[in-house]
Amino acid sequence: MSEPSSSKVKADSLLPPAKSTTAATAARSANGSTNTGASQLTKHGIELPSQEDAERLGFNVFSHILDPRLLRALADLGYGIPTPIQQKAIPLALAGKDILARARTGSGKTLAYGLPLLQKVLDAKSAVAKSDANHQLTRALVLVPTRELAEQVFRHLSVVIEYVRDDIRLVNVAREASEKVQRLLLSEKPDVVIATPSKALNYLQNASLDLKSGMESLAIDEADLILSYGHDADVKSLLGANFLPSHFQSFLMSATMTSDVSKLKGLLLRNPVVLKLNHDDEAASGSNLVQFYTKTTEEDKFLLAYVILKLKLIRGKAILFVNELERGYRLKLFLEKFGLRACVLNAELPINSRYSIVEEFNKGKFDYIVATDEPTGASGNMQDDEGDDEEEDADEREADEVDEQAEDQREAGKKRKSSEHAGAETKSNKSKVSQHRKGKNGASEYGVSRGVDFINVSCVINFDLPTSVDSYIHRVGRTARGGASGTALSFVVPSDQVGRSKYLYCASTTRDESVFKMLNKPSTISLLGSALQEWKYDSSSVAGFHYRVTDTLKSITKALIREARIKELKNEILTSSKLQSHFEDHPDDLAFLQHDKALLTSRAQQSHLKHVPQYLVPKIINPGAKLTKSSGSEYKGYVPKNKIKDGANDRKNKGGKRRSSTGKNTTGAAGKSRKKVDPLRKFSNK
């Protein structure tokens, strides 16, 4: 879909656009391929499928290098055409190359490294007799920055191995389970282990996890966040100590190229193939993200959120990102006052509850999530990514020009030196690592904007502008995933408006203009694929809602927010314990979980706010259209103070006569008696 030619965009344009190798591998390759299109030959002499073949054959274009059982599972899951990153990464990975891939979120990076990783496990086990002790070894480790992403990767790979479950076992040690249970699972030497760096290091140090005996592949997903999420000490200890074999294949998958990725590249990769998904590839995959911004005040943020959601200027599901936990609950309570159901996704909730919220949202049980994306580590610092592309091009040229054997020797020397240096530092780092885990482990392993796969999200609203370009890229990556279309809208507070409203003040707004300037740099626009367009709305058309919004915001006090947080946290802790035990045996009971239930008491709720009087509806809405309440009943313009009793013939409302057991006519309980009785007349003072 082409972008609007004018920078002035009408309010209704916020509607999202329409959706548009090993011996075994060599043996399969000898059987021939059905490809007939013009395949691409890389400078490494590896054949890549053409776009025409990929569109015609789907994942069967890899039939000569992937196990038929994996292809069958992909077909059952409805996977059609492999994405550009998958078309390039899978053949190169199965040829034994280290991969450094940069592609936007939602481009299919998980399968891009997951399929080669699983295929290598199948090939290795087929070459060893089952009676051999080396048949069952842990051959692959997948490191991710957050527990949510670990669970997501585990579930994605679990369905892909549907027809090879007898040959491949997966374990996710990032889950909240007792260490005794996890150690028991690891003692069986699962083929693939998925973990956060801190969890992996913990089990390596207590000898529960053995990677040195047989690990062949190491994949780091969301590599740009691994170090910035407070895992830097854990990663350095994991790579520097004597836990890993001397040779293994590495995959670094990232949405952005940062200094953290460069550090990991130097530590892990040997003569890597650098893959960068360009905008032509994104267009070929059908990605269509339209980005808007508007400059507004803190109070008007709530006004615009109300107008956009209540008047349904966007259709479908939406994620609203805030930078502070308290603001997340303030926004939820604010929307709740107007009858808009939403839930808050934040680091305070147990991991099972957080993942359950994502699952319910993906299933369509509610349409709006308020996600706290608090700046942590390097992500909280403003980063100027200008020059990243030049660094990548230089790195790629260097990787191509250097002779592979000389590079291997040099990297081996580096690893020996780093191993010796790390050995000397291990003792001094141990105390720091343990202190870091005690204080920050829970928060560092939470991240809703990074990697978590939200399904069919129509719009991302940056209620609070992120504090870095990288964070912005990850946030807007929650929509327009997998070839779908989506919209991103960002609220920017001008510097002269910062701090005007003390009770709505957000510290990160002091950086809004600086971050906004970085988002408009040519290098960032090139990375995003398009520039942000200004959304200019008619302020007079929404002025009538100001009094509603202002009064409602004043009613949401800090005490009310604190009570709501405590109430929800207690409920979610109970829910989480049930999820761990009871709901594993009774999955149908999950339907009774409601993570978006009201936090306000019935007295605090004002039912008239759930309706929009017809005289307030702006002209941008079709005058003939009828707005609907959250319950789905028909909208009525006039809302009286007292409830109107409908149905004149209804016995319950009318209070009609009924015959008692004695045969006398009595008045219905809901109706009024014909003769008023004064109780004081019958009162006798005896």
Swiss-Prot record:
The keyword Nucleus applies. Residues 20-36 have a biased composition (Low complexity). Its main location: nucleus. Residues 288-543 form the Helicase C-terminal domain. PROSITE patterns: HELICASE_ATP_BIND_1, HELICASE_CTER, Q_MOTIF. One of its GO terms (cellular component) is nucleolus. It holds the Pfam family DEAD. ATP binds at A103, R104, T105, G106, S107, G108, K109, T110. Residues 1-41, 373-444, 631-686 are annotated as: Disordered. A motif (DEAD box) lies at residues 221-224. Its EC number is 3.6.4.13. Residues 419-428, 643-653, 676-686 have a biased composition (Basic and acidic residues). Signal peptide: none annotated. One of its GO terms (biological process) is rRNA processing. Gene3D superfamilies: P-loop containing nucleotide triphosphate hydrolases (3.40.50.300). A motif (Q motif) lies at residues 59-87. Keywords: ATP-binding, Helicase, Hydrolase, Nucleotide-binding, Nucleus, Ribosome biogenesis, RNA-binding, rRNA processing. Residues 429-440 have a biased composition (Basic residues). The Q motif is unique to and characteristic of the DEAD box family of RNA helicases and controls ATP binding and hydrolysis. This is ATP-dependent RNA helicase DBP9. It comes from Mycosarcoma maydis. The lineage of its organism: Eukaryota, Fungi, Dikarya, Basidiomycota, Ustilaginomycotina. The gene is DBP9.
